Amino acid sequence: QYGNALFDALLSEGQEFNAVPYGTEALGVMRIEKGHVAGNEINGQTTAQNLGLSRMISKKADSIGNILSEREGFNRSDIATLSGFKPVQRNQKLEAGSHLISAGKKPTMENDEGWLSSVAFSPTLGHYIALGFIKRGETRIGEKVCAVNLLQNKTTEVEIVSPHFIDPEGDKQRG
């Protein structure tokens, strides 16, 4: 009953701060641009190590995720880590769920090195961007791999980049 009045009041009060309304789709794009993880990245299979957050797990005191972080399988050097991806040909669309295969290799399970978890068109950058996981991602920045979508019979060459597409230092965020 009071929703419209509240909305109008918030817009009115926010005018001096250049506040504008935006929807959840815009929020989703902004979180990908900023490299923030959400449901597609934290799906029950990911650990702090996958997300590049292992230094936040206390080695001295008990903490959530501490026991899991000590398991041998999660401490391998080839673990898939959160990375950013952008198409080499900027006009190409990316597809969430695409598998990541090194250039020149066949798209087989043995050659699968990761996947694109979240994709959006970035109006700020003017092209598609993606978050995803790829083996040793943090050491492969600048490398080009293939994003393969077998359901649509589509292969797109992508570059591995930082998952922080916009304002990586947080200057805009902090003002």
Regions found by a protein language model. Give the residues of each.
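Conserved, structured C-terminal
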Residues: 1-175
